[in-house]
C-alpha cells in the first residue's frame, strides 16, 4: 500500500510511475488527496473541539465550589454541545476515512527504475540463460504421457477424487515430489534461511497484509464458513508472521523458508497451457521470504536471484531469467525476476519461480516496521521468491531426462530419491 505522504507530496510522480504498469491513477490519486485533506481538516477540528471541551469541563468544578451554579450550568451546556459536535465530527471522519482507505488499497505498487517498459509477457527482458537444451529423440513424449507410461502421476484419479488440476502422485512420482521438497529446503536452510511450517489457511487480515486481498479474491479458495482462505503461496502466512511487528535494527537480515501445498483457482485457464502439470489448482512449492532495511533490499534481491539460479543449475535444467516489464508485473511488486525452464518435449518455456522486491508496499499494509540506527521507526522492505515451484520442475525433469526406456534422475537429487532412474 502506498503511503498517504507519498500521494500527498508527489502525486504526479505516482501517476507517472503507475502508468508503467498500465494503470491510470489520475482520478483515484486526485480523489485520495481530496479525502486526505478532509481527513486532516476534520482531525484538526476534532482536536480543537476536544481541547475546548476539556478546558471548559475543568471549569465546572471551580464554579460550583464558588457557588456560581448558573454559570456552571451554562458551561455544562456548552460542554454538552461540544460533545455533540465532537460526535458529529467523528462520524463524518469515519465515513471519510473509510472511503479513503478503500481507494488507497486500489493503487498497485510503484515499479522501480530497473523495470522495463512493456505491456505483456512478450516485452519481458531476458537477462541471463544457462544449461544446454537437450536434443530428444523422435519418440520423446510430453510429461503427461510419461506420467501415464511409468504410472507415476494419475491425472484421471485426481479428477475422480476432486476435479481437474488435482493430480495424484504415485510410487516414484510421489517419492520424487518428497525428494524435491527436501532438496529445496535443505539448500535454503544451508543458506541461512530459517525453516517454518505455517498454516495453509489464513484469515482475511493476512490476505490483506501481503496484497492478495482485495485484489485476488477470485483466484483464491475461500472457506466461507470460517472466512479463511487457502494459501496461494507460503509468502502469505510467512510474511504475516511480521504483521504489527517492530524489529530491532540488529535483527536483520530476516530470512525464512517454508514448504506448503498451494491452492489457486486459476479461473478461465484453458488450452495447451493447462495440460498435465502445466497449470494446477493444488501444487507443492517451497518459498523464501526476507525482511530487510530499505538500503539493503536490492542487494538481498540479487542474493535471492543468485540463490534460486544455483538450485536450477544443480538440477541441470536449461533456464532463463527474465526481468518483467511493467505491464506484466504483479499488483504488489516493485520489481520481479521470473525463472523459466525449457520443456524439451513441449518445445516451450515454463515458469518455475518469481523473485520479487515489494519495497515498503506490503510492510505498510502489515505495519511491519523497525527501529533504525537513530531509533526512528521506519517501514521495512519485504521480498520473496519461489525456490522452487514443483509441478513444472517435475514436468521439465521428466521430459528433458527421458532416455530410451527410462527417465534419469539428476545426480544432485539421487541422495534424496534413493533411486537413479524411473522405468
Where are these regions (language model features)?
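N-terminal alpha-helical targeting/anchoring segments
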Residues: 1-134, 152, 156
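TRNA-recognition modules of translation machinery and tRNA-sensing kinases, especially anticodon-binding
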Residues: 129-423
Amino acid at each position: 500500500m502506498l503511503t498517504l505522504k507519498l500521494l500527498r507530496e508527489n502525486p504526479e510522480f505516482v501517476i507517472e510511475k503507475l502508468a508503467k504498469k498500465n494503470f491510470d491513477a489520475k482520478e483515484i490519486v486526485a480523489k485520495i488527496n481530496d479525502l486526505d485533506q478532509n481527513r486532516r481538516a476534520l482531525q484538526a477540528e476534532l482536536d480543537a473541539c476536544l481541547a475546548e471541551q476539556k478546558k471548559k469541563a475543568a471549569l465546572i468544578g471551580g464554579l460550583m465550589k464558588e457557588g456560581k451554579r448558573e454559570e456552571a450550568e451554562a458551561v455544562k451546556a456548552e460542554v454538552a454541545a461540544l460533545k455533540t459536535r465532537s460526535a458529529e465530527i467523528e462520524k463524518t471522519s469515519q465515513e471519510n476515512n473509510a472511503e479513503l482507505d478503500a481507494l488507497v488499497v486500489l493503487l498497485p505498487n510503484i515499479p522501480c527504475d530497473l523495470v522495463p517498459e512493456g505491456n505483456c509477457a512478450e516485452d519481458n527482458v531476458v537477462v541471463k540463460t544457462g544449461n544446454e537444451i537437450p536434443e530428444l529423440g523422435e519418440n520423446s513424449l510430453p510429461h503427461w504421457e510419461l506420467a501415464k507410461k511409468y504410472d507415476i502421476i494419475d491425472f484421471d484419479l485426481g479428477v475422480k477424487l476432486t476435479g481437474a488440476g488435482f493430480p495424484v502422485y504415485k510410487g516414484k512420482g510421489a517419492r520424487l515430489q518428497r525428494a524435491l521438497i527436501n532438496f529445496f529446503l535443505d539448500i535454503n536452510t544451508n543458506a541461512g534461511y530459517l525453516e517454518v511450517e505455517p498454516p495453509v489457511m489464513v484469515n482475511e487480515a493476512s490476505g490483506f497484509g501481503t496484497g492478495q486481498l482485495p485484489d485476488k479474491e477470485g483466484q483464491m479458495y475461500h472457506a466461507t464458513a470460517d472466512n479463511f482462505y487457502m494459501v496461494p503461496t507460503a509468502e502469505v502466512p510467512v510474511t504475516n508472521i511480521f504483521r504489527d511487528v517492530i524489529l530491532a535494527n540488529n535483527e536483520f537480515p530476516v530470512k525464512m523458508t517454508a514448504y506448503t501445498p498451494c491452492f489457486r483457482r486459476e479461473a478461465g485457464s484453458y488450452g495447451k497451457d493447462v495440460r498435465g502439470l502445466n497449470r494446477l489448482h493444488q501444487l507443492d512449492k517451497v518459498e523464501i521470504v526476507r525482511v530487510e532495511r530499505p538500503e539493503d533490499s536490492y542487494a538481498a534481491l540479487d542474493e535471492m536471484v543468485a540463490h534460486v539460479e544455483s538450485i536450477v543449475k544443480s538440477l541441470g535444467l536449461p533456464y532463463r531469467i527474465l526481468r518483467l516489464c511493467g505491464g506484466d508485473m504483479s499488483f504488489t511488486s516493485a520489481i520481479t525476476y521470473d525463472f523459466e525452464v525449457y520443456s524439451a518435449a513441449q518445445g516451450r518455456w515454463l515458469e518455475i519461480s518469481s523473485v520479487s522486491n515489494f519495497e515498503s508496499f506490503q510492510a505498510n499494509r502489515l505495519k511491519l516496521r523497525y527501529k533504525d540506527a537513530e531509533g526512528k521507526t521506519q517501514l521495512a522492505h519485504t521480498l520473496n521468491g519461489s525456490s522452487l515451484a514443483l509441478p513444472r520442475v517435475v514436468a521439465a525433469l521428466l521430459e528433458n531426462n527421458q532416455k530410451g526406456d527410462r527417465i534419469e534422475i539428476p545426480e544432485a537429487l539421487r541422495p534424496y530419491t534413493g533411486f537413479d532412474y524411473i522405468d
